[in-house]
């Protein structure tokens, strides 16, 4: 019998103590160091975590940009979160499992897990883990038990391919096109696109740089 996946979580009451918000918050420095502290994290069976509203599952949500474009894809049936199937997304990432916990990690796996998730989801091998925002959406059942951490990554070329069946038709689209009509996006992507200028500005302030284009 296959062992059930165990995913990284923290108690919702911790979020309530820090200050509830709905949507996207740029105050990542207030939340991330606390909710990723080793003493505050635990791993739960995913089936239980999806139903237990006492906990929030930590989800890295990475925006990948290249030459004025952003990576967009459609959530396919191969993705584990059936409630998002068919929706467009600009965020790469997913649940951090106990297997993602680095042997010598002192953060119980968030930063190690974020890098591993990105390598598994798309063909991207090197990632800086600068976070620019956090996301909470208590308006939906799926959002109530998840907590997103937004990262911005710039790549030198568009040679990024989806490695999982849950990523359908990945393509880089101009930023203006991506933000023009957000009706077909999942809620977390809508939040990011609505605040995209602020996210990119914060990324620049934090030192996330645009790489030079590779020479052919």
Regions picked out by a protein language model, each given a short descriptive name:
Residues 2, 86-102, 133-135, 143-216:
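Nudix hydrolase/Nudix homology domain
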Residues 2-36:
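Extreme N-terminus nucleophile/cap motif
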Residues 22-69, 75-81:
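Acidic, metal-coordinating catalytic segment for phosphate/diphosphate chemistry
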Residues 58-61, 110, 149:
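Residue-level detector of short, conserved catalytic/binding motifs and their immediate flanks
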Residues 67, 122-126:
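A short, structured loop/turn motif at beta-sheet edges
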Residues 69-116, 120:
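Conserved Nudix-box catalytic region and its N-terminal flanking loop in Nudix hydrolases
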Residues 125-133:
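A short coil-to-beta-strand element that immediately follows conserved catalytic motifs
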